[in-house]
């Protein structure tokens, strides 16, 4: 006999799946949507209650999207199978939010670039540096994660940045890095790294178009600030 409580064990009018069929997915709470994905609860706790606890223990949806396997399996009742479902759902959501007609995406403003990386980078617990590669028409031809750690001009080497740009025959690049604090205000080191990479790009004939600093749902463009 199985001890796991399933959605079907709930009263019919409380079953998330039945409510979704009847009222549409938009009528379900976050816990109910997660319950539909996970399917079964645990001994003594139905899936809606477990889902609600998972969301709360991770600090809400933003925490869900930025937690890892270790974070999830540390929650009572969440094994690797359930954690894998949540991680897959979160990753698919991130990719969908950044999807812009595949390769046919033109960067016309800092906002256009920020859309591509915001959902992935806004809640990262470490600093990540990404480079968006553009062709002569400002179309995106690639996005590469080139560095993890605190941005420092003595550590961030132009070789890693421009290796991918040269390999992809990029005409220009946009740098993007996050501040785990959520505050995108540029530090002196951010500015120093930017100037150094700009000079290197000029020597190589690859323009550094902008450097975006990503915070929690907000960003700063060094170009718009007149720094670049």
Swiss-Prot record:
Pfam family, one: RadC
Keywords: Hydrolase, Metal-binding, Metalloprotease, Protease, Zinc
Example of a GO MF term: metal ion binding
Domain MPN positions: 106-228
GO biological process: one example: proteolysis
Organism: Clostridium kluyveri (strain ATCC 8527 / DSM 555 / NBRC 12016 / NCIMB 10680 / K1)
Domain of life: Bacteria
This protein's name: UPF0758 protein CKL_0865
Motif (JAMM motif): 177-190
């Amino acid at each position: 006999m199985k001890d796991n409580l399933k959605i079907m064990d709930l009263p019919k009018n409380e079953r998330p799946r039945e409510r979704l069929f009847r009222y549409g997915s938009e009528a379900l709470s976050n816990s109910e949507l997660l319950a539909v994905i996970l399917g079964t609860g645990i001994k003594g706790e139905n899936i809606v209650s477990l889902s609600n606890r998972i969301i709360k223990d991770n600090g809400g949806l933003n925490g869900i999207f930025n937690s890892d396997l270790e974070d999830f399996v540390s929650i009572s009742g969440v094994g690797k199978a359930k954690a894998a479902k949540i991680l897959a759902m979160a990753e698919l959501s991130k990719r969908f939010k950044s999807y812009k007609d595949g390769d046919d995406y033109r960067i016309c403003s800092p906002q256009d670039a920020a859309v591509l990386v915001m959902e992935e980078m806004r809640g990262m617990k470490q600093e990540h540096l990404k480079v968006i590669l553009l062709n002569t028409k400002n179309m995106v031809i690639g996005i590469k994660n080139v560095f993890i750690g605190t941005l420092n001009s003595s550590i961030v080497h132009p070789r890693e940045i421009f290796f991918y740009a040269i390999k992809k025959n990029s005409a220009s690049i946009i740098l993007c890095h996050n501040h785990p604090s959520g505050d995108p205000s540029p530090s002196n080191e951010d500015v120093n790294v930017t100037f150094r990479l700009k000079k290197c790009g000029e020597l190589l004939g690859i323009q550094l178009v902008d450097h975006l600093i990503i915070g929690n749902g907000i960003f700063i463009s060094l170009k718009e600030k007149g720094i670049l």
